[in-house]
Regions:
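Noncatalytic, solvent-exposed loop/strand surfaces
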Residues: 19-597
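Positively charged n-region of N-terminal signal peptides that target proteins for export
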Residues: 1-4
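Bacterial N-terminal signal peptides
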Residues: 7-14
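Small-residue packing motifs within transmembrane alpha-helices
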Residues: 6-7, 307
Length: 598
């Protein structure tokens, strides 16, 4: 009988190794791992052809109609483990508006009625070279109401894979634990007791750590029938939740996470609104009127990040004031570790990113007022602040040295935002002047690391204001639109510029029709979370409708046109264990690669 020990031990070792390899090459969550680094240790394929195309959002034409032709929906990243793919699919009902855009006047249609849609998590599997449906799980999750706070930008629905299960967001702050193989419910986890409150929402993607714990944000909002949940009432509750592998859950309130933040009815610094006082700041000593902060809560699409040492990172903001924002660190038992304010960190405003007008030309376009203090944000007359907006999907990224990146929004650099870097102890280190709706990808190499982020320059708006009658708000030209690789100090190493100028669409017969020179300065990069493979190859989407693979040195490796040049909320992509690329365009899942190696 003792002779059986060696085969049994060998079998255990082999099973353990196979499990570790499956996990190493999986894409189980936002940003691939709990640090959200966007890196996977496989060699990505060259996207030479489409291998699959599946519609997951049938409401795209209606969504575009209500958004003036754009697609303002944040979608889940395709989750992958082995030969299985897990993706959101939308069903239910889209309520059309009597007149396109009338939801903006409060009509119960379009984004104001997106709770009539149904969200499903569907398992797909590769069989005989085709990606086919395996099972479907219909959840009761709904997004936060649009109200006057989300402006038609649909929040993200985002499960996570962990230890053989799919954790799927549910209603009332709950999570469904679903068997990964067959879609059967294993348990329904409710951290808030037996009640399921329809005005309590799982907010943002779920994050799974290496120990099988799952983390997510929850917020409770006012019933829209009582008051607008964003500006008519303070947030009623906000929590970070941790679910252990045994389904036990624990919560901590955001009020406890940011004890030094302004209170719900305290005043927070405002911005200048009166366009008759342009150029801003109105005077060297002007101070904008304050307004109520609101209680602290997470940003709508924020996923917690988990460092290898167990530290948890999330983003908090005032309910009424996105500038009253913090990077928050927690211990693994959900006790507060530290909080770092994002306010008044930047000195790159007037005189740097924005010229200060000369006395001889006080109305110089896109300039600060004569005599302005160098470095200030002209909209506040104070050092610039990173803000946490509910319209983006930026999420903390933990770097190899333990420091943390966050993408934030700033208005005064033509809405490009800033990528901010903090130390593991909460000290502010530096910034790069783009960060809007971005979770950057990280590539370790040569004893250091590099960071990849989109770097769009937006046109059609002024640098810091929107009055078309004022020279201070002269619209900027579009572009350039770059993918930029930064070093560890957030200094550019290379930039890859989008040079596509024509708008194309794929016809039903597979042919492609293009209209030339619609975008003479190129297209935006339509990416909120890039992918980097083991060779340093970067994979990104563009609003020109193509998937791009960029070499490690920033040159083009290959690009593949998918379906349609489209203006859209930025989308993520992922890689499978065999290097296939899973990307998105026009509400459709595309798989690209070199062939059908099954």
């Amino acid at each position: 009988m003792k002779r059986l020990v060696i085969p049994i031990l060998c079998g255990i070792v082999l099973l353990t190794a196979a499990k570790a390899e499956l996990e190493r090459t999986a894409w189980p969550q936002w940003g691939q791992n709990a640090q959200h680094s966007g890196f996977i240790g496989v060699q990505g394929q060259t996207p030479k052809k489409q291998l699959a195309q599946i519609v997951y959002d049938p409401f795209v034409p209606q969504e575009q109609t209500e958004a003036g032709g754009e697609l303002l929906v944040h979608y889940q990243v395709p989750l992958i483990e082995g030969k299985h793919v897990y993706m959101e699919f939308k069903t239910g009902t889209w309520v059309p508006c009597s007149t396109p855009g009338s939801w903006g006047n409060g009509e119960a249609c379009g984004p104001n009625a997106w709770n009539q849609e149904i969200w499903n998590e569907k398992a797909l599997a590769w069989r005989d070279g085709k990606l086919v449906a395996d099972w479907n799980f219909q959840t009761d999750w709904k997004p936060e109401p649009n109200g006057f706070g989300l402006n038609g930008w649909e929040p993200v629905f985002h499960p996570a894979l962990s230890r053989g299960f799919v954790y799927v967001p549910g209603a009332g702050g709950t999570v469904w634990k679903v068997n990964r193989e067959n879609g059967h419910v294993v348990s329904h986890i409710n951290p808030f007791g037996s009640m399921v409150d329809p005005n309590t929402f799982v907010s943002g993607p779920l994050t799974a750590d290496a120990h099988g714990n799952v983390y997510y944000n929850v917020m409770q909002l006012e019933d829209p029938a009582v008051a607008d949940p964003w500006f008519g009432s303070d947030v009623l509750g906000a929590w970070l939740v941790k679910v252990k592998p045994n389904d036990q859950s624990m919560t901590v309130t955001y009020a406890d996470l940011v004890p030094g933040a302004p209170g719900a009815f305290d005043n927070c610094p405002g911005i200048f609104f009166d366009t008759t006082t342009l150029p801003w700041p109105p005077s060297p000593t002007a101070v904008p009127d304050p307004f109520p902060c609101g209680s602290q809560r997470p940003g709508v699409n924020v996923a917690p990040a988990i460092a290898p040492d167990g530290t948890i990172y999330t983003l908090s903001r005032g309910h009424f004031d996105q500038f009253a924002a913090y990077l928050v660190a927690l211990n693994s038992d959900l006790t507060p570790k530290w909080q770092a304010s994002l306010q008044n960190r930047f000195t790159d405003g007037c005189g740097f990113l924005i010229p200060i007008a000369a006395s001889a030309n006080p109305n110089q376009p896109n300039s600060c007022r004569v005599g302005t203090t160098p470095g200030v944000d002209p909209t506040t007359n104070a050092p610039g602040s990173g803000s946490v907006t509910d319209l983006g999907s930026s999420t903390p990224t933990v770097l190899p040295d333990g420091s943390v990146l966050i993408g934030t929004f700033t208005l005064y650099n033509a809405e490009r935002g800033h990528l901010m870097k903090f130390s593991a102890s909460g000290a502010y280190l530096t910034a790069f002047d783009f960060g809007w709706d971005s979770t950057p990808a990280v590539f370790r190499h040569d004893g250091t690391y590099s960071i990849v982020i989109k770097d769009n320059h937006y046109g059609g708006i002024g640098l810091y204001c929107f009055d078309p009658t004022s020279p201070s708000c002269t619209p900027l030209p579009n572009g350039p639109y770059n993918i930029t690789r930064l070093n560890a100090d957030l200094k550019p190493e290379w930039k890859f510029k989008n040079t596509t100028t024509g708008s194309c669409q794929r016809n039903p017969d597979g042919s492609v029709t293009c209209t030339p020179n619609t975008h003479p300065n190129g297209f935006e990069w339509c990416i909120n979370a890039p992918v980097i493979d083991e060779n340093g190859t970067v994979y990104v989407n563009s609003e020109d409708g193509s998937l791009y693979a960029l070499n490690r040195n920033g040159t083009l490796k290959h690009k593949l046109f998918l379906n349609l040049a489209i203006g859209a909320a930025y989308t993520p992509l992922s890689l499978g264990p065999d290097g296939k690329i899973y990307t998105q365009n026009d509400g459709q899942l595309f798989v690209a690669g070199e062939g059908e190696d099954e």
